[in-house]
Regions:
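Adenosine-nucleotide cofactor-binding segment
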Residues: 197-200, 212-283
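Glycine-rich beta-strand-centered segment in the early N-terminal region that forms part
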Residues: 31-53, 67-124, 163-165
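N-terminal Rossmann-fold NAD(P) dinucleotide-binding loop
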Residues: 204-205
Length: 388
């Protein structure tokens, strides 16, 4: 192995954030372990990337809609200009530091995925078990070099052993984003419940399948895109409500969707409404459509302020709002593994056949990466993988 490797990067010495888009494929230094120079390398691992998934946050970076400040601050701290992007990984360990081998058991040849949040283990949240909201967490591919590269250097504590005899590698590369849906769907007990999933993008589609697998009595999607409507139905949605074009204020709930969700639940409202789109109006629609005493799960992310209509309804009707970020480390990963390794129901094959379309246009060889065609792919498919 040489001293350089190919990677997809944001290079601020060549591209001004506000005036550019996409990622550059260029050679960067290949990561190495050298405990004699940096004692922290003892707990690090070098992973050879096999598959890397393109996430919604990567889309935010590609189109310069999100994470610019976080990336700039981390590059300033590291005194460099290039950030290797990407955090959804399946790879093979090629080198492990002494501590990584002794304390975590990693050795060359092990197949792993990774949690995308590098936690400190010392802040108050980490010490009480809420490490998924670590105070100083770094995010792989944003504030730490990521996996859109031939090799990636990661702390052993973030890695997750994966059996590719039980989970096909393309699906195994999606454990991290799939875990977002698992976290959302385990915030409350869904067994026997009616669930509305507002926004059937990638994580929303995962949530449809997970909610069904976890025993939801009724799963209803809300989604405008025809292709995603078909996928939601194929993944187990009993019904999918298609919103109409609207001219109202950006935060006002959709009365037509609310009426349809009430009709589908005999006028009661859904037990659980999941807002997966990041739309202020969708959040208010979720609140308006949930039953008295019900739960609203907020996963969709949008920066800035939001307006909640009729806050008195939330209080008087006993509606509980839950926010979801990332995955509970590593509780969610254990549930994810069990769901994907199970063959009843076969979520594994549903993901491969429905979301990844058995690799047709969704698995792109890294060697053939070309910005224009790749951008078309990420706009057509809910999930795209790079194969190394």
């Amino acid at each position: 192995m040489g001293d350089t490797m190919w990677a997809l990067v944001f290079d601020r010495s060549k591209d001004e954030w506000a005036k550019s888009r996409g990622l550059r494929k260029q050679q960067v230094p290949r990561p190495h372990l050298d405990v004699s120079r940096d004692y922290r390398d003892s707990g690090e691992v070098i992973v050879k990337t096999r598959y890397a998934g393109f996430c919604g946050s990567d889309r935010g970076i590609w189109f310069r809609r999100a994470f610019g400040d976080m990336m700039a601050e981390s590059l300033d701290r590291e005194r460099k200009d290039v950030r290797v992007v990407g955090h959804e990984l399946l790879g093979e360990v090629v080198e492990a530091g002494p501590e990584a081998e002794r304390d975590y058991g990693y050795k060359p040849g092990d197949v792993v995925s990774t949690e995308s949040h590098i936690i400190c283990n010392t802040c108050y949240q980490c010490r009480i078990g809420d490490n998924h909201v670590c105070e100083t967490a770094r995010i792989i591919g944003i504030s730490h070099d990521g996996c859109f590269a031939e090799y990636v250097k990661l702390p052993a504590q973030t890695l997750w052993p994966t059996d590719v005899k039980k989970i096909r590698p393309e699906v195994a590369a999606l454990q991290e984003p799939f875990g977002n849906a698992v976290h959302a769907c385990t915030k409350v007990n869904l067994r026997g419940k009616s669930v509305a999933i507002i926004g059937c993008g990638t994580i929303g589609l995962f949530a449809v399948a997970v909610a069904r697998a976890l025993g939801a009595r009724q799963v209803i999607g809300v989604e405008p895109m025809e292709a995603h409507i078909r996928m939601a139905r194929a993944l187990g949605a009993d019904a999918v409500v298609e919103p109409s074009k609207r001219t109202e204020s950006s935060y006002v709930h959709d009365a037509a969707i609310t009426a349809e969700l009430l009709r589908l639940t005999d006028g009661v409202g859904v037990d659980v409404a999941m807002e997966m789109s990041g739309s202020n109006a969708a959040l208010n629609t979720a609140i308006s459509a949930v039953r008295r005493g019900g739960h609203v799960i907020m996963f969709g992310l949008k920066s800035g302020d939001a307006v909640i209509e009729q806050i008195d309804k939330v209080i008087v009707e006993g509606i509980t709002l839950h926010s979801v970020v990332g995955r509970r480390i590593f509780e969610t990963w254990h549930i994810t593994r069990n769901l994907l390794e199970s063959r009843d129901p076969d979520l594994h094959d549903l993901i491969w056949k429905v979301i990844l379309d058995e690799g047709r246009g969704t698995v792109v060889p890294f060697a053939e990466f070309e910005p224009e065609s790749f951008e078309r792919a990420i706009q057509v498919h809910p999930k795209v993988l790079l194969r190394f």
